[in-house]
Amino acid sequence: QGQVVDLSDWYTTMKDNDDFMNYPGRRSIIEAQADLVQAYWESNLDSYDRQRMASERPNFRCSVSLPEYFYIPLDLYYDFGGKLGKQIHSKGKMEALNEALYKLPTAEQIYSPEKYFSEEPYIYVDIETLELENFTVIDEGKIDSLDLVYLLQTKIGKNEAVNAAIGLGGGSWVDYINDSNDLFMTVKILGDDVNELNEISDAFQNWAD
C-alpha cells in the first residue's frame, strides 16, 4: 500500500487540517486490501504450515464490556469496508483496490457499495453562522454518514441508523458556547433526494423521542 500511496504523513495531514472526511475511506480500503492479501497468502500454505499457523495463533478473549459506540467505526472499517473491498476486487482485482486508495470512498459509499460504483458524490453544504446572544462559535465542520450512525445507533439501533445514513447527501454543523459553558449546535443536512431526507428526519425524530 505504501508503494501505491504515500502513507507517511496522511494522518498527520488530516489532523493538521482538522479534516478527517477521508479517514473512513482510506482506513477501510487499507484494511480490506490487507485482509485479501492475508487470505491469498494463507490459501497458498501447505497443510503442515496451516496446522502450525493454527497452533501458534493466540486465543485472545476480552472480558471487558465496552460501550456500543466503541464498535461503530470498527463496523464501518472492517465489516462494511471489507464487503466493499471484496466487491471492488471482484470487479477489477488488486488494480481496482489500488485505485480506490486514490478515490477514497465516502462513509456513505462504504455503507452502500453501489454508491461507490455509481460515483455518487458527497455534496458540500454551506451553513449560516448565527448571531446568538451571549454565544460564540467554537468549532464547525462537515457531517458524513459515520457521524449520523454515531449519533443515532445507540438509541434507534444499527439497521435504522445505517439506513438513514445511506441517504445522506452532505451536511455541515456549527458549535456555539456561552460563558456558562452551555453548548448549542446548528446542523444543516442535504439528503440524496426528498425521500432519503425524510428518512433521515424520521430517524432523528425516533432518536429524540
Task: Indicate residue ranges for each PLM-predicted region.
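Post-HExxH zinc-binding segment in Zn-dependent metallohydrolases
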Residues: 2-54
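C-terminal soluble interaction/assembly domains
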Residues: 180-209
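Extracytoplasmic/secreted envelope proteins and their assembly/folding machinery
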Residues: 31-38, 82, 86, 94, ...
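Generic structural signal of hydrophobic/aromatic residues within well-ordered alpha-helices
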Residues: 7-14, 49, 53-56, 97-100, ...
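Hydrophobic residues within well-ordered, non-membrane alpha-helices that form the packing/core
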Residues: 38-42, 89, 208
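Pan-zinc metallopeptidase signature
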Residues: 59-181, 185-188
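Soluble non-cytosolic domains of exported or imported proteins
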Residues: 21-32, 72-79, 91, 194-198
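Substrate-binding/catalytic groove segments of enzymes
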Residues: 44-50, 95, 195-197, 208
